[in-house]
Amino acid sequence: MMSKRKVLPVMLLLMMIGAGGCSGGRTTEVVFPESPDATAMYDTTVLHNEAKWTVNNAHDPGIIKTDQGYYIFSTDVKVGGEPKPGVMVRKSDDLIHWKWVGQALPGIPQEALDWTGAVNLWAPDVVHYDGEYRLYYSASTFGSRQSMIGMAVSDSIEGPWSDQGAVIKTKSDDPLNAIDPNVVTDHEGRMWMVYGSFFGGIHIIELDLSTGKPKEEGFGKLIAARDMASEDGAVEGPYIIYNEKFKQYYLFVSYDSLFEDYNVRVARSDSITGPYVDFNGREMTDTAFEPQFEVGTKLMGGYKFGEDEGWIAPGHNSVLKDGENYYIVHHARGEADKNWSYLHVRKMLWTENGWPVLSPERYAGETEQDIPEAILAGEWERLEHDPFVDGQNESSKLTLLKDGSMEGSRGSGSWIFDGKRTLTLTWDDAEAGGGQVETVQVLPAWEWERGGGALAFTGLNDGGIAIWGKQISRISK
């Protein structure tokens, strides 16, 4: 998070390491990102000055890249007052520094207002098709199923936008909720909308390419749900991507309470319409499996490194594929005051068997690169995103020793490195398949908690639990 400590001056950190074992004694450089601008936490001086919000008051962010830069459209929220309705818009040239653009719409479109009585617009998504931008938005009130997903169109990403009315409506007695749209084109060129929140779960419906609205009547097909009795049906914020390398569709959703224990889950499928299964082969529609919190591979929940305040309730994500790089975009709340929501952008990496994993640190311009093994030994903070933990997962100490052994609060074991980016941690006291082996990727990062460049790692253990780590100090001898 934004540290209370002083952030280091802007600089490019280069470590010149004598790469032991490399022929010719050549040196290897690890390039760390420059210091990003820190946004002060809980800064009441900017409450009524949107131009100074930067990443403040960002909720349910949907991202799109255009020729003019990166744009994020997000839910109308504001700490300390009522937000102006109309879908908030921000812009960036680098995914790090964000500028306020304004509201996409002049207010709540009349049809949406009449149907729902909404006071703000939620969870937008923007796509570009055949020279036209299409903005999908949600109108509802908290806890209601009297909801509507609408659409507006424009020739320009910054508008003006022309409202096209309802895409899908639900009534208070319908079994599902028409909010949280995400529009995705499959690998065959067909367009779909995935949507839904709590109540009847997540549905997918095919859209007419020419209109951007459903091709047929009805609500579409159910692709994710949770048990109403034990979990209140708490699943929302769906987002689907297709990874050409693995020939898989990936469904991201958020579980639980957006103010308390929000967390991001993922499952995948050969088909855009499912079934979507998690790391352990459980279908996302399996509401009978117990415990329900083990359905869906948990990529990220609340977390806390060391003595830092940490973050709670990260969720409602979108995903950006930019060239060969993937990024996850989501909001999170500071632990000290959950009323404030902040925009986070993180690098997304992929395991060898095709599962996404997330950087422990927010993006600051780092690039994936080979890491010299000589600098891995040292003190680390390691963190498990245990699906059983509702609140913050807290880090614990991990020491990687030069002889290939490791020690920590988790126990003892050994580590090996492939000479490039993959680090394998094997614990002596765990059963195979129960978290014994953790396969993680090492990458440079900006350590927001203390300031400065640092190595980090991210991956999954053999039970599908997400593992994060960051280096605190190195053992040089």
Question: For each predicted feature, which ranges?
Answer:
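Bacterial N-terminal signal peptides
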Residues: V10-A19
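Carbohydrate-active catalytic/glycan-binding domains of CAZyme proteins
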Residues: C22-K477
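Bacterial N-terminal signal peptides that target proteins for export
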Residues: M2-L8
